[in-house]
Each structure stands twice: as structure tokens, then as C-alpha cells.
């Protein structure tokens, strides 16, 4: 039996006692032998940054509420936890703190594990792992070597952001105003060998699979559809001539708008395109531009916003219909890694080409018009002013200035051109995808070593499976430049597994999205010799996955792709890794600042600020507690270090207890919406917890309750019992179907308030109160499990795991009312109410409605034409 001080709610004592009980009984450790239906629920695993933030608390509390509820409704529930432990932040911390990334990472894991345990999550800790351990990453190394043999993993050159000072590749977000975020060096675009996985081989399946994911938010599925970007078009060949008219390798371009082909006035190629490099050999000015463009962005987002730049190469492309020669230009908005690295430019019907052509004085030709213009503006075409209809394929279009294709619509032109090019061998119909193969190489140390050996004779050779894992050395000296394994000859140098000759290991490591793409399956069998074992098919697909919508594209796309790789390797049977996805909103908070001397802002933590209000409670200002002087109110924004508006979960748990923090994080907003952190709201939740504690202890202090006798209840007792069972029904629906935890809490609060006004001290009055209090404790258990654990004992039910106690079921008979209150309307306007027996006859209801004093006044002098009764709700008297 736990020792809890009666009458006084001490959250820390209550929570320590409950957690000790759960640990001693291994309450949340599960296996696959249960006859109960399985439910696999988890949140996206955290990066061990050193401390939890409120976003973590909200995320993990959501999944914990669902997990505990599912246990109480008879499910065998798995809720695991692990650590996404590789990545750049550990390298940065190693430099800053002069320590090895591994040491920093493992210390953070220990600290954050303790924080998670203090919040009382129902986690099966026996399945915990960190992705930076060889026991974990050996399996993705083995999978990679198998993918190499199947041709699904391959190596080719790719353009990356290169920091020449730090000697490393930078992610796009690490390039700030063209410079490395840490070194400040001007970033170059460099082409280096990279390993890729052929996710494009699965593009159509990834797209089609979205239609089966009924439990995923439409917003996420739309983002994935757009990212995959399926488009149908033609691939067309343009012959190329140099300045002397000699033939060069032809260009192949893909277009979804072959109907605009006669509007091509130039062809654009990427700065890295072989034809651009060829032309630059005899054109110093072009060579200088190509060198400059090395410092530009490599992402599509950057290319959309940067200034359009380019130069004529001196080469020409032969128009495949007219035979005219059009110039070939280098353009900084064409990506070598996307499509063929060349696009046909139709400035009359593509806004990007239009802007480029106007800048450089290139011809602009109209070749499409609207068949049914809606106004005069849509009848005019102006080569100097862009209008959206120029490129609107959703409208009925007609070709003009297109020789024999004049008068055709889009579909007719598409078919005619496709037939012509396929017949002449100049092109073909093709489905294209915006999705590109997944580049998995990272020029970093703190990651999983790529299991490849480079031999001068044999080339790239996968490390034999019996030599795996290739272990990353953890005890290293870490500096700002390069990677420790690149400079360690004892690690790097090895022998070729094929010929036995001297060779070198790959010193790149995997993209950390590799580890997070299959961890959900590993939780099912964390000690399996292979990547997973048969237990994976018991648990997979996971039933609920909780995480932020910011992961909609990269993580969730790779996650789905890798699961299909595992399926095709016969490791799992399911097509998709997760059935239902819940994307929780951000945690936001007030921001405060003072103007800095350098023109910037000094952000001040909300905990250091006192809000000033007028007599109506409206905010009038804020002052810094330390000096009493005013600070500016910056509005509410996502909690972040940059705005210094984060709230430390540990300090909140220390001040209020874990249950109160959990309760507020679920009450303040629906899961999908942003949660505004407000300590006044946390205070309100703390008051509710104390009130509930006092209600239970006051009831128990008055003696044991007798057995409930439903037949002997008074009308008031029945009303309270009805409220109890209405609440049970609503909370069950809110937890199980709607995931609307805030309204579930509100319903329990309403019941608590109703119970506080119920002062019936009779035997059956106390029996009704006992039933209501037991229901409240169980209904709140998924959210406030520590207090529920204690109060269940106070109510005389003994110390037990409440997750093994059945979730309350609404008694339908308790919902039946003996009497009903009906609204009385005269000609649709409310004039009064009447109380009638639930089984009252129609004639009796009509008579009572007409006799209601206020209704009778309005009926005076009128004749009743019709009486409409909506059962249980309204009596509408139509009179005239």
C-alpha cells in the first residue's frame, strides 16, 4: 500500500509512490502472448539534445493518454521509447564543450530518460535503444549492402553546399546569406560522389499508397502528393550545334506542356551541365559565371527566390518542329540534379522564363489563347506584362502561331505531338516525378558508417555481412574541420574483401533520416539478430503515430519508403508502417524584449516578466521583475531558444507536479492546434487537482458508502447519476474516436462541479457520489495517472494498476429521464418551458403547453391551427 498523506494533495509524494509501484511491477512491459487485440502507439523518437521542451511534453502526453486509454479498453498496448542519437548537434556540442560527441550524447540520454520517467509515461523501457549504438546500426548497414547488390543503392556525383573552411558539406538551412553558418566562409557548390537510394523506383507506389491511409491527415497526404509530384508529359529531343555548326550531344527535355512547343525561343541548362562546361572552355566570361554560380543555392526553394541570372553559351538547339536554331543559355534556376538538367524555355507561357527573357531581351511569342475569354483583359496578350492566364491549363485553350497545330486544344496537341515524335524517334510519352532519389551520404563523423570499401582494382565493394558492423570509433578528438575518421589511417585503411589488396573504407556516414526510417519496426523486436523478427508482424503496422506536421515530407516519406524496402526483403508483411497519424500543433508562448544597442532585440524569458493589467483584466504592459522597468510585448510565437520564450518542463513539474503539467497540456487546446502556454492556466489546473483530491477525501471521511440501489433513487440522485453516465459516454468518445482531450477534461470538470452542489448525505446519495467519484478517477487516469492511482486507493479499491481496470461504460438505463423539460414556442418563438413525464401522452403535452402562463398570454385571441412536437425537445404551437 502506498503512503499518501490524506486530505493534502502533495503531487510529488503521490507521483513518487505511483512510479515506484509501476517500476516494481513492470507495469508497462508487454509481450506478444496476450489474447487481447494489439495496439501499437508511439511518438516520434526524440533527439537527445540535453533537455525536454514543452513540445516534447505535449507530444508524449498525447500518445500516453491514448496508450493508457487503450489499455483500459482491453488492448495489449506497446508504447516504446528510444533516441535518435546521431546528428550534427552532437558535433557542434563536441566542439563547444571539447568533448567527444558520444560522451555528450549518452549523458543527455541519461538526463532526458529521467525527465521522461518523472512525467509518468506508460513506456515499455525494456525496448529502449539509441540509434548510435552498433547493435542498432549494424542492421541498416546490412540492409544497405543488400540494396547495393540489388541495384537499389548506387553512387554518383551530386552537387552539394561545400564549406571550404570547415571542409564539410552543409545542409541548405546551414547556408545563411551565401555563407557557412559557423565558419562564415563563402559557400561553394561542389560536385562530389554521393550514395543514393532509388526511392524513385517506388514513386508510384508511394503515391498510390496515400489513398489507403485513411487515418492520416489530408494535409500531410497532400504535401506528400505534391512532393512526389507525378506529372505526365513528353520527353523531347533537341539536336545541338556548336558555334561552328558541328553537332554535339543532343539535349532531352521533359515538358508537361507540349502544346506550347512552338513558343520555345531558347533552351535553359544548369551551370553544371556538360554542355555548359564544354562551352566555357572557349568562353572565359561564361567560365567566370559558372564559377560564380557555384556559390548559389542548390535547393528548389532557393532557386525560386533568388535573382534570375544567366548567359548565352554560344551553342544553339534545333527546334524539333520548325528546324529553327534557338540559343542555349545557362540559367541559375535550372538544377542539374532535377530531370535532365535542361528545360525548353517558353517565355510566353511560363512566368520564370518570361522574367528571364525580359531581363535578357530574348524573344517572347504567344502560341496559346483562351477559347472563351471572360473579359477584355483576357483577350489581350502583352510580352511586357505577365498575366496568370498565359499559363492556365485549367481553362479551355487553343493553339495559335503553331503551324499545322493551330486550333488544337491541349489534349489534341498533346496526342498529335506525341504521335509525331514517337514515330520519328525524337521523343516519347513519359511519366515524370518531382521526387528525387534519396542522397544518404553525409560528410560528417557522428553518424552510421557507410559499409563500403574502395579498392583500386575492384571499385566500390560492400563490406561482407560477417564483417559487420563497421563500428564508428567513439573516443575521438573532435575539431572544427573535417572528420576524425577521415584523418585516422588505422580506421580508414583496410583490405579489399574481393581481392585482398590494400583498400580504404568509405568515410562518409549515413543521413540520420536512415536511422529514423525503420526504428518503429525495431521496437517490436529490439533484441532480434536480424533487423526484425516475426514479432514485427504482430505489432506492425503501428496503430497511432504522433508527431509534428513539419515531418510530413522528409521523415514520413523516407519512413514509408524504407518500410517497403523491408517488406520486399521479406522482413515485414505490411505495406505501410503506420495506420493512423496524429500531427500535434506547436506550443507557443508570449515573447518579451528590449531594444538592443546594436539595433536588434534582447529577448527576455516570460518567467522574468510581470504582466500589468487594468481593472478589467486586459493587458496594459509588462515590466522586468529584476528592475521594474517596462519591456516590449512581442506577441505569441513558437517556443524557441532564439526568442527565449521556452518554459522548462522540469521546473513546471517541480512546481506543480507531473499530473498538473500533463492536464494543462491536454486541456489548453485540441491536439492538432497550437497550444498557448499560460501559467495562469496551469494554476487553474492545479486548483482543479486540489479540489478533486479534497472531494474524494471529504466523501471518504464521512464513512463507507453503501451499495447503490438504482430502484430506490430520488429524482435528484437520478439526475446526478445521469450526469455521471453522460460524462462517461462523452469522455469515451473524446478519447477513443475524436482524440479531443480538452473536451473530455471539461466534461469531467462539469461533473465535479455538479457533484460539489449535490449535498445529499443519505445512504443512496453517498452511493451515487461514490459511483461518480470512482468514474471521475478512472476517466482522468489516462491524463493524471498518478493522482488516479492514489485516489483509487482512497476510495477503498486497493492499490492496483488502473490500466487493468476496465474503462467505465455508460449505463444506458441511467440516461433515461423520468421527466423532460420541453421548450414551448408560439409560431417558432420561444415563450416558455414545461416539465412533463418522460412517458406523457401527446394530448397531455399539448394541454400543458397551451396552459403554460406566458404561452397562454401570447395565444390569447388566436386560434390554434397545429401543434408540432419534437420529442424530448420542443412544442411549437402554430396559431393565427
Curated annotation (Swiss-Prot):
One of its GO terms (cellular component) is cytosol. ATP binds at residue 641. Gene3D superfamilies: 2.20.28.290, 3.10.20.590, HUPs (3.40.50.620), Isoleucyl-tRNA Synthetase, Domain 1 (1.10.730.10), Valyl/Leucyl/Isoleucyl-tRNA synthetase, editing domain (3.90.740.10). The keyword ATP-binding applies. A motif ('KMSKS' region) lies at residues 638-642. Its main location: cytoplasm. Its EC number is 6.1.1.4. It is found in: Cytoplasm. A motif ('HIGH' region) lies at residues 46-56. It is an enzyme of class 6 (ligase). GO terms for biological process: leucyl-tRNA aminoacylation. Keywords: Aminoacyl-tRNA synthetase, ATP-binding, Cytoplasm, Ligase, Nucleotide-binding, Protein biosynthesis. GO terms for molecular function: aminoacyl-tRNA deacylase activity; ATP binding; leucine-tRNA ligase activity. Belongs to the class-I aminoacyl-tRNA synthetase family. PANTHER family: LEUCINE--TRNA LIGASE, MITOCHONDRIAL, LEUCYL-TRNA SYNTHETASE. This is Leucine--tRNA ligase.
